């Protein structure tokens, strides 16, 4: 019932605008085929998964002050990997973490799944320096490229490389621009378990540094945080940190600090290098086995890593104007496990791309990256 009322509200709001006032409608998206070959650890049997994935992004601007947006993901997954991990893999794909369940099973069997997910459905209203967005949306408070302790609403999972748009939250976001480079944001969301996340953020600029401070609640925790983005002699320098303290045990807990610092630089020949570290005060200094499959986990800022300390590095280079090479890695110095992610991106035509990537996990059993084996991807993507 709540899903019906929410969708009805969005469309009734749009219907109040007269037809002659329609300003613009846009529709973009893509169609892709992604093949995954997985060599699990501790076995010689490889398995395979194929995905046909279509995305549509719709935007309607009936008048200058209103924007209605919808984003729809249509997925057809099939292959031996589906059958080998049925029904757990299917259940994970169909799980919607929003307050509204907008993930729909269209057809499934032990070896295939066809489903649709609406990850954007919102209305944005603008009045001079004030903006308000209501509905399923992406609230991005993160700064760093890999780990985002400030991103308490839609936490970025680095390993889920094929979902660049990121999941949305059923939320209300209000933003007031206090100046050319400053703003005040108030956001609140409910998840599938009716857990509330709400916070206030103030962003401003000092001496060419963008600074942000936030405070609020994330489910059962009080959270305060800050972040920055600037440069030191041409080197990009960013960071963010958040501190969490359980509200139910406020007096007898030490809380949890998660912080990440990053630096990046682009050379004149377009060689790009990026390095980052993350610290988790509640992380272990021993084997940091992740326990669940890294690609399907619903991470939050407290679970970006189970280790006390991780290091990230990346180097990318445009070999030609149409070919980009990239290699990245994450190292856990406590349990000596390693992730490596080499990739090649080919621009075949203006709207057609071929992407080849590996996600290679190394380490002893029960270490952070030691139990997943190697995954190889081939993706053909047409954008429109």
Predicted regions and their residues:
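Outer membrane beta-barrel
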Residues: 65-181, 363
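Outer-membrane beta-barrel "beta-signal"
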Residues: 313-317, 346, 352-353, 357-360, ...
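Transmembrane beta-barrel strands of outer-membrane/channel proteins
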Residues: 29-35, 70-74, 134-136, 186-190, ...
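Transmembrane beta-strand segments of Gram-negative outer membrane beta-barrel proteins
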Residues: 20-42, 70, 182
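Detector for outer-membrane/organellar transmembrane beta-barrel domains
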Residues: 231-330
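Residue-level signature of outer-membrane beta-barrel architecture
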Residues: 58-62, 124-127, 176-178, 203-206, ...
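Repeated loop/turn-to-beta-strand initiation elements of outer-membrane beta-barrel proteins
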Residues: 25, 64-68, 129-132, 181-184, ...
């Amino acid at each position: 019932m709540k899903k019906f009322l929410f969708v009805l509200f969005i469309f009734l709001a749009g219907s109040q605008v007269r037809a002659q006032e329609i300003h613009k409608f846009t529709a973009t998206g893509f169609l892709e085929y992604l093949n995954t070959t997985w060599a699990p650890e501790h076995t010689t049997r490889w398995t395979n998964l194929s995905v046909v994935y279509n995305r549509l992004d719709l935007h309607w601007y009936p008048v200058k002050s209103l924007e209605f947006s919808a984003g729809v993901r249509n997925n057809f997954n099939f292959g031996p990997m589906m059958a080998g991990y049925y029904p757990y893999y299917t259940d994970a794909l169909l799980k919607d973490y929003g307050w509204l369940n907008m993930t729909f099973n269209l057809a499934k069997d032990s070896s295939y799944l066809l489903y649709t997910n609406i990850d954007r459905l919102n209305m944005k209203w603008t009045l001079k320096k004030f903006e308000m967005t209501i509905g399923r949306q992406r609230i991005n408070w993160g700064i760093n490229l890999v780990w985002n302790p400030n991103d308490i609403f839609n936490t970025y999972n680095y390993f889920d490389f094929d979902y660049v748009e990121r999941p949305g939250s059923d939320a209300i976001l209000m933003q007031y621009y206090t100046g050319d480079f400053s703003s005040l944001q108030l956001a609140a969301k409910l998840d599938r378990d009716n857990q509330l996340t709400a916070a206030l953020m103030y962003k401003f600029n000092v001496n060419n540094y963008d600074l942000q401070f936030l405070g609020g609640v994330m489910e059962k925790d009080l959270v305060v945080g800050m972040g920055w983005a600037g440069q030191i002699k041409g080197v990009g320098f960013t960071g963010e940190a958040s501190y969490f303290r359980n509200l139910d045990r406020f007096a007898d807990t030490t809380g949890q600090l998660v912080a990440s610092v990053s630096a990046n630089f682009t050379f004149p020949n377009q060689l790009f290098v990026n390095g980052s570290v993350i610290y988790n005060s509640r992380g272990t200094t021993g084997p940091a086995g992740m326990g669940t499959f890294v690609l399907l986990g619903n991470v939050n800022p407290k679970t970006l890593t189970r280790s006390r300390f991780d290091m990230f590095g990346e180097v990318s280079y445009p070999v030609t104007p149409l070919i980009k090479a990239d290699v990245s890695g994450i190292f856990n110095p406590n349990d000596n496990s390693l992730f490596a992610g080499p990739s090649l991106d080919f621009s075949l035509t203006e709207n057609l791309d071929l992407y080849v990537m590996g996600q290679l996990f190394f380490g002893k059993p029960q270490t952070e990256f030691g139990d997943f084996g190697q995954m190889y991807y081939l993706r053909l993507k047409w954008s429109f």
